[in-house]
């Protein structure tokens, strides 16, 4: 029997204060999770006028007809939609020009403190009994009801704590013999951590030794690759302790120049951790939830027990990772690898992947057996799209703002219905840009939780003659008013296109029919060229020029304005690279001239190192390539080559006139050419990064070269390989490069091995795609062998040396 409590007798009740209400509107928005391009199909909603996001947030807080859990803001229509539902219980759809704001408190399935503010959807007690609805009177007549306590969140039969009970959320039960019972709600990770603290969101900002944490958005005193904007789902706020890389517990970079990083002392939560989902005896996805008993690697090695340190020492122990199911010596995937793996009992082989039967072919799996799986379609190289891009089957997987596309078969971070099963003829392969619903151009869901979808960074195939400026334009110079093409997002477009992509005439900017508006008028935006009904981009929309339409049911739409063809811009190849995902040992042969900045350094006509064209007269390479240099007359630079063993028509051969080594002995050097290279579609410079720019960890980059292939394939042909950047903190672990990597160097590679630069690739480029161009971020420098497991390649960071590079070129 439970003791007597306020739940059984009348007692004065402390009225609940909604803790998420703040005094300032700016603070109020901190209590919302926002997602661009997302819309809810809510049944309880109101459409209201709203001039700003803050205005809409205030209207949501003031709503009295229902509990407002979310709102949508439509900037071009100046409209708020306040709603009773959120994404937990209502389908989410993609929509243009909308940002969905959801109250964080209604998305959480955990409690803070005693759970007085808990608004989750758990509806059963600790003992597994279903909760009675708060509005019901059977089997128990409640003392706490929605009518008496309208601010207590007494919805449906969800667990709540309307009387501030110190034991946490509870509910009346559907068992006639048990009036009420407590619910098993996990603690939110703001004061404590579950598992290894991957989801810790607290504000502890000191390390175990008492050092202050360095802010995540700072690069001083320690430069690093955990840039908050590149890790939107890791909550890298302020200088709070976090765990973005799968360590045993949260940590931070420190403000002590002598101590790069250190663990933080975060207490463990006393409640059970949230469920990680069902365990499978077969391989589903990457095997994150594999719970089978396979204990042999793919090459036949027996697995080492996770709790043991011989023959291989490691920190991936059951004690450090209590929620990763590291039992016995069974294959597991505790760190997000491509498949389950284990340390081996062979002292010469540290770890290997395991061969696990797939759930798709396993009799143990009955999930979705009735759904036909479309055949895998082979993507074809395509540099542009025709029409609205429904037929596009290329391999581009980057959005117009540079975000990476989410796989069409994945539901993380965005759940959706545009799957290969639902759209079998739409070519929804991998995470490639597609147009399954006949939008204006190819698009994709993004891997950024804050941005549901975006159009892709693809140009439309055009029959229009190229418009090449007579001379390069200075930064900031706009395209001529008469040009009916746009540069960038078209904010400076002043052409006369006046119909939408669907062919609907545009409404005049000064008119208020059929659509009323007040923000984008000639009076409010006198510098935006809002003349007549011409397509314009007054708000800098990343999707380009738009207009209000003459269709009363369609407030606005985008216009089909082509990009102006410019002269050869740095980092923009005229041939779309293959970007093979293969693992230049083990890479793939590149498409000819798709990496037009690649240079072959020749000594007596023989290739010995790579290099990168960074301007018509300058090449960047590795200093160690020039250690035993003879007279400069022996050296030539070869540009525009694909097959280094054949003299191709596109090749330019230029002697080297001067050599400049970096003065602090970094492995980087500049070569001045005796004459400028002729910029063609086969010869284009790569872009330099901003000074001291840090490449984010896990950024996908590419290396190219003619180096040693160790008998793989493609001898003599330029090869490419895709490599993720590895944070120096990880790369310098004992099992990898053991502290050898300097702050002015970066690591990139697949830790399993199989892909790497090798002899002859030294000095060549490591380029990373940023928004719409390739940036030279690294110069191939050194490695411990070629493509060895656990030994990624090391590259000189280019950004710290940009001031020296620019000054050297300016003076010479």
Curated annotation (Swiss-Prot):
Q: Which residues are glycosylated?
A: 315, 365
Q: How is its activity regulated?
A: Converted into plasmin by plasminogen activators, both plasminogen and its activator being bound to fibrin. Cannot be activated with streptokinase.
Q: Give residue ranges for domain Peptidase S1.
A: 584-810
Domain named Kringle: which ranges? 110-188, 192-269, 282-359, 384-461, 485-564
**Keywords on record:** Blood coagulation, Cleavage on pair of basic residues, Disulfide bond, Fibrinolysis, Glycoprotein, Hemostasis, Hydrolase, Kringle, Phosphoprotein, Protease, Repeat, Secreted, Serine protease, Signal, Tissue remodeling, Zymogen
The record's disulfide annotation reads 56-80, 60-68, 110-188, 131-171, 159-183, 192-269, 195-323, 213-252, 241-264, 282-359, 303-342, 331-354, 384-461, 405-444, 433-456, 485-564, 506-547, 535-559, 570-687, 580-588, 609-625, 701-768, 731-747, 758-786
Listed InterPro entries: Kringle, Kringle-like, Kringle_CS, Kringle_sf, Pan_app, Pept_S1A_plasmin, Peptidase_S1_PA, Peptidase_S1_PA_chymotrypsin
Annotated active site residues, numbered on this chain, are 624, 667, 762
Q: Name the CDD domains for this protein.
A: KR, PAN_AP_HGF, Tryp_SPc
Q: Signal sequence: where?
A: 1-26
One molecular function GO term is:
protein domain specific binding
Residues modified as Phosphoserine are 600
Q: What does this protein do?
A: Plasmin dissolves the fibrin of blood clots and acts as a proteolytic factor in a variety of other processes including embryonic development, tissue remodeling, tumor invasion, and inflammation. In ovulation, weakens the walls of the Graafian follicle. It activates the urokinase-type plasminogen activator, collagenases and several complement zymogens, such as C1, C4 and C5. Cleavage of fibronectin and laminin leads to cell detachment and apoptosis. Also cleaves fibrin, thrombospondin and von Willebrand factor. Its role in tissue remodeling and tumor invasion may be modulated by CSPG4.
Protein's UniProt name: Plasminogen
Protein species of origin: Bos taurus (Bovine)
Gene encoding it? PLG
